[in-house]
Swiss-Prot record:
Mg(2+) binds at residues 81, 100. 2-[(2R,5Z)-2-carboxy-4-methylthiazol-5(2H)-ylidene]ethyl phosphate binds at residues 145-147, 176. It comes from the Bacteria. Its cofactor is Mg(2+). The gene is thiE. It comes from Mycobacterium ulcerans (strain Agy99). This is Thiamine-phosphate synthase.
Length: 220
């Protein structure tokens, strides 16, 4: 699993797309375009606003859809925040925020096979993640984003810092990244990115993913 993480470049966060009812088709398209890791994150989504928070059984059902799609495309499936859901869904990856479970507690729940990542938003957090127990970390937001309302964006300066201190540990730039902004992110030193709307809001998710992946691979 660590070798797959090392080669991963494009990480997608998607909601359950309840208002559209097309999660399976969307996931297949995005993964066919080159997404390496696909994560379910329904917080603040249009579906949550319309239908309310995703219940645990519905979250597991959505996880099963994404896990099956990821397996078909030799990609990895990630769960956000919830170590119990990650274990029940047999997720490849669990992603934690700074205020979520400590990494050692989460790993005790998921088991050793599940990779664990963590969000970082300042230099101290980046430095800690670079030498800590997480398998990868995310750096940002690079720009303000509606998926994290009210959060100050540390910007590309933090990406440059991560590029200097991360060493061999995989890390991903995150926050407001799309095809137009990707060259700036690459110039700052990132070689892996997390995206949301750049693919979820695209008319052709497969094409959007393929374009991003092509630019990422060209920068290696």
């Amino acid at each position: 699993m660590h070798s797959r993480l090392a080669t991963a470049r494009l990480y997608l966060c998607t909601d359950a797309r309840r208002e559209r009812g097309d999660l399976a088709d969307f996931a297949d398209a995005a993964l066919a375009g080159g997404v390496d890791i696909i994560q379910l994150r329904d917080k603040g989504s249009a579906g949550e606003q319309r239908f309310g928070p995703l219940e645990a059984r519905d979250e597991l059902a959505a996880c099963e859809i994404l896990a099956d799609a990821a397996a078909r495309h030799a990609a990895m499936f990630a769960v956000n925040d919830r170590a119990d859901i990650a274990r029940a869904a047999r997720a490849d990856v669990l992603h934690l925020g700074q205020r979520d479970l400590p990494v050692d507690v989460a790993r005790a729940i998921t088991g050793p096979a599940t990779l664990i990542g963590q969000s970082t938003h300042d230099r101290d957090q980046v430095s800690a993640a670079a030498i800590g127990a997480v398998d990868y970390f995310c750096v940002g937001p690079c720009w303000p984003t509606p998926t994290k309302p009210g959060r100050t964006a540390p910007g590309l300066d933090l990406v440059r810092f991560a590029a200097d201190v991360a060493g061999a540990k995989p890390w991903f730039a995150i926050g407001g990244i799309d095809g137009l902004r990707l060259p700036e992110v690459l110039a700052a030193g990132a070689r892996r990115i997390v995206v949301v709307r750049a693919i979820t809001a695209a008319d052709d998710p497969r094409e959007a993913a393929a374009k991003l992946k092509s630019e990422l691979l060209a920068a290696i």
